[in-house]
Amino acid sequence: EKQVSVTEFDVIVIGAGVAGLTAGTRLAKEGLKVALVTTGESTVCLSTGCIDVCSRDENPLLGVAGLPLGHPFREVPGELIREALTDFQARMAEMDLSYAGDPEKNRRILSAIGAFKTTCLTPSTMEASAQNEDEKIHIVTFAGLKDFYPSYITARLKNASFSTYDAGAATTMGIAARFEDEAFLEAFILWMEQLCIHEDKIAVPAVLGLESADEIIRKIEYRLERPVFEIPTIPPSMPGRRLFNALKDQYRRKGGVIYWGWPVIGVEKSGKQIEAVMAESQGRPTSLNARAFILATGSFVGGGLTARRETITENVFDLPVFV
């Protein structure tokens, strides 16, 4: 029989996405002993790094208020959503990852295939994104990069053109790492200056650095004297990874504990009261006890839900799922 170790916390958060890390940080900041349990890589890394609220209305708060009765988002007051978004922007600014946007006004960003995505808050590196098909933009792509399609964009945007730079790397992560080197950035800017770009804006796939994208984009804009913006690539995306790293680092700074790569394999109850979750690492089970539990496992991609032919199942507590 396996030996089970027991660890006590005030709150256990299950899931390491935006919701889980934000909740954990807020609680740890209040002085509670918080643990976050996750199976591994967060699906935030697959995202654009943008924060969507409700894309059906130009004003996302009005969009939420207009959702059908019974929709869970209708239960959240607009003032609370506004406060949460403002708090998120302040916390990300603390981590040198500034976000642009207004809780009461949706915006559009250009995607890797030339379509427009409606969102609420964007990394500031996307703030200057084209807003319609008529804008004059020059796209700079990178030799061998498979997660970005400039020809799709120029097919949809009649005033767009593109050039290709050989970064000596062909993955989003590899190119982003190169941009952290000042000599590489200087060579890239010199090459761009020689292009004599005449369009109003410059677009680049979202590879402008691992952690220093804000600073890198400011340097390029200063030298080329026009707005520069990142376009999210096909997942995995650097803006999503930057967001995840900022949230995770902030959570740890506030004193939060992370059980990384620890799938929850069971739940311990006393009647209807949950007292602990059983998590496993390298075949060794650990009972993680807490006074409260927050479920933030997401939906299908993150493993929070499983879809079968007739049913959808919640995988940790077997909670009812309403479809």
Question: Which ranges hold each PLM region?
Answer:
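Helix-loop-beta segment of a Rossmann-like dinucleotide-binding subdomain
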Residues: 73, 125-145, 164-166, 170-175, ...
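Dinucleotide-binding Rossmann-like beta1-alpha1 core, especially the glycine-rich loop
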Residues: 52-145, 152-161
